[in-house]
Amino acid sequence: MSLHQFLLEPITCHAWNRDRTQIALSPNNHEVHIYKKNGSQWTKAHELKEHNGHITGIDWAPKSDRIVTCGADRNAYVWSQKDGIWKPTLVILRINRAATFVKWSPLENKFAVGSGARLISVCYFESENDWWVSKHIKKPIRSTVLSLDWHPNNVLLAAGSCDFKCRVFSAYIKEVDEKPASTPWGSKMPFGQLMSEFGGSGTGGWVHGVSFSASGSRLAWVSHDSTVSVADASKSVQVSTLRTEFLPLLSVSFVSENSVVAAGHDCCPMLFNYDDRGCLTFVSKLDVPKQSIQRNMSAMERFRNMDKRATTEDRNTALETLHQNSITQVSIYEVDKQDCRKFCTTGIDGAMTIWDFKTLESSIQGLRIM
């Protein structure tokens, strides 16, 4: 595991370039900082300044090398690099509330933006007018959209929102998409078609994170009621929900067809397994706690504790986990969702950690990624 402390401020969101030599992140303000890897060090290479509200989402297209950002200023920008300088292009989102999340489609010919306007803007490039335009998916979303993920077929889009529901929509745009083949989620896919809807009916919580599996037939999501759920379209959209004993999870990703990694307010990533019978189980926390060392306190430390914490005891305030505050995002670092070798987490502590499954399997007894 390698931990790098980028900032004292929280890292709101991050995105990697194709070969993982650069990371774009937002230091909880209106800027995007791009860091470049030099040996074992990370040095700041660029600052992207165009938004005038907090950045809420970043995604980096691996093939076309374009960055898309969205923010609380209700805008999104597509950034392209020319002669070593990143230039922004404004996207016409047509929303009257903050944008909350952005994600490139697998073919990188469109992207989706969630927002507080209770809608999803699906954006594509209109070459005759030379600008990015959007189409809206509105019904039946009844609250802020918090998370999005694309199906591998470049058409279906999963969305988690504050109305306690996770939905799968068709984001088919005839101007840029070929007619999609039938999927286990359905065969008719006009734009905005609701393919599936999960959750709600008085239970659940805000849906913080969603993730399709590599095959696209499974969908995982995490909610504010500390549940993890998986829906399997190949099993007539059977849903398996696991209520955990942990604090709410904020981000989720498939790391193989049967394994899911999620992380959130407990400050450490967790592994869940979804077997072929449709049973979802908790496997393990993926953080090996550091051993705390008992030692005697000096008089100086005793008085300092009395002054700062109103106690004479030596209470170590550092957490045993690598991250010292909530993890806000999980992303694939090496290979892909089919066979992930390493994944990355960033959090409110301003740190970024890269987790290696091979190292984790050797340090956690009985751990196997299936």
Curated annotation (Swiss-Prot):
Regions that span the bilayer: none
Q: Which GO terms describe its biological process?
A: Arp2/3 complex-mediated actin nucleation
The UniProt entry, under Pfam families, shows: WD40
For this record, an example GO cellular component is: site of double-strand break
Q: Which domain of life is it from?
A: Eukaryota
Where does it live in the cell? Answer: Cytoplasm, Cytoskeleton; Nucleus
The record, for PROSITE patterns, names: WD_REPEATS_2, WD_REPEATS_REGION
Show me the WD repeat boundaries: 6-45, 50-89, 140-179, 202-241, 244-284, 322-365
- Single GO molecular function: actin filament binding
Q: What keyword terms does UniProt attach to this protein? A: Actin-binding, Cytoplasm, Cytoskeleton, Nucleus, Repeat, WD repeat
Q: Where is the signal peptide?
A: none
Give the Gene3D superfamilies listed for this entry. YVTN repeat-like/Quinoprotein amine dehydrogenase
Major location (coarse):
cytoplasm
| The protein's assembly and partners | Probable component of the Arp2/3 complex in which it may replace ARPC1B.
Purpose of the protein:
Probably functions as a component of the Arp2/3 complex which is involved in regulation of actin polymerization and together with an activating nucleation-promoting factor (NPF) mediates the formation of branched actin networks. In addition to its role in the cytoplasmic cytoskeleton, the Arp2/3 complex also promotes actin polymerization in the nucleus, thereby regulating gene transcription and repair of damaged DNA.
Q: Which PANTHER family match?
A: ACTIN-RELATED PROTEIN 2/3 COMPLEX SUBUNIT 1 (PTHR10709), ACTIN-RELATED PROTEIN 2_3 COMPLEX SUBUNIT 1A (PTHR10709:SF11)
Q: Which family does it belong to?
A: Belongs to the WD repeat ARPC1 family.
Q: What is this protein called?
A: Actin-related protein 2/3 complex subunit 1A
